Amino acid sequence: LNLQSTTYQTRGVFPTSFVEEKGKLIADYGQRSIGRITSADASLWWPVLCWLYVKKSGDQSFGTSQQVQRGVQLLLDLVLHPTFEGNPVLFVPDCSFMIDRPMDVWGAPLEVEVLLHACLKSCIQLMELSRKHQKSRLLDQRLVLTRQWVHDLRQFLLKHYWVTSKTMQVLRRRPTEQYGEDQHQNEFNVQPQVVPSWLQDWLENRGGYLIGNIRTGRPDFRFYSLGNSLACMFGV
C-alpha cells in the first residue's frame, strides 16, 4: 500500500513494477514504460488479494486499518467518477495493459473489466467490514454507488461480451448505422463482415464464451482463456 501513488496526476494508481535501490523502493508509474503510461490492471489486484487475506486469516484489524480503508477510497475515487463514457467499464488506453501490451487491447479488454468486477466486490467487502466498527454516511453512500456499479458492470458484460451460436446469428441480422431511439438494437454498430467466418462452426450449439473486447464497429472476437477463467472465478 505504500506504493500507491499520492500525486495529483496518478493518485490511487499502483505501479506496474518496482525495484529496490539502496534500500528504497522505486516504483514505475509509467515513467519507465513505452508511452509513459502505467498499467490499468496493476491497480485492481490489491483489493482482491487484501480481501482474500482477511477472509482466510481472520485478521479483521488489518482490513479495517486506516491504511487499507484509505487505499480503498483512493482507488474508488480513481474508478467511480464521471467520464465521457456512459458505460460502467473502465477505459484502458493504448499501452496500458500489464498482461500483453502489443496485442491491440485498448478500449475495454475482458481481463481488465472482469478484474474490475472482482476489485469492486472486494472493496465492498472491505468497506462493509469497516462499517461494522465505524458508522459513516459517506461510507454508506460509497457502498450504494459501488454495489450499483458492480451490478451494472456484470449486466453489461453479459449483454455485450457473452456470445453463443444463437447470438451470432442474431448479430449478423441486426441493422447497422442506427441513430436515435432505435440504436439499442446495435449499440456498437457491429458490422456483419467483422464477425469471423469460423466462429459459428467453432461455437456449434454447446456453449459460449466472453469475447476479448467490445469497441464501436470492431469487437475483438478472440478467445482469451485468462479473461474467461477469471470471469468464472469471480462470479461474472
Regions found by a protein language model. Give the residues of each.
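Catalytic cores of carbohydrate-active enzymes
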Residues: 9-11, 93, 106, 115-236
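A generic structural signal for short coil/turn motifs at secondary-structure boundaries
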Residues: 62-63, 100-103, 134-137
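Short alpha-helical interface elements
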Residues: 71, 78, 100-104, 175-182
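Generic alpha-helix signal with a bias toward terminal, lower-confidence helices
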Residues: 26, 30, 52, 91, ...
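Acidic/His metal-coordination segments adjacent to aromatic residues that form catalytic metal sites
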Residues: 16-37, 92-109, 202-217
